[in-house]
């Protein structure tokens, strides 16, 4: 599944996790992406959208 929102272009972010003893390990944070049917130019199309865009109403769901 895609790791990038097609609406806001939010994607994976890389960083470092620290343990209690301050040892580092590289890791990634991925956005919560859902595959939904949405209206794109008046036609229903399957798009990959983050949950923040779904909740804020930036996407009109196709029923």
Swiss-Prot record:
Gene designation per UniProt = rpmB
Q: Name one GO molecular function term.
A: structural constituent of ribosome
Which residues are in coiled coils? none
Question: Which SUPFAM superfamilies does the record match to this protein?
Answer: L28p-like
Give any single GO term for biological process: translation
Full protein name: Large ribosomal subunit protein bL28
Q: Where does the source fall among the domains of life?
A: Bacteria
Q: Which GO terms describe its cellular component?
A: ribonucleoprotein complex; ribosome
């Amino acid at each position: 599944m895609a790791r990038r929102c097609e609406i806001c272009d939010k994607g994976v972010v890389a960083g470092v996790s620290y343990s209690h003893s301050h040892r580092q390990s590289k890791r990634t944070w991925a956005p919560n992406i859902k595959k939904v049917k949405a209206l794109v130019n008046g036609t229903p199309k399957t798009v990959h959208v983050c949950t923040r865009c779904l909740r804020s109403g930036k996407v009109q769901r196709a029923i």
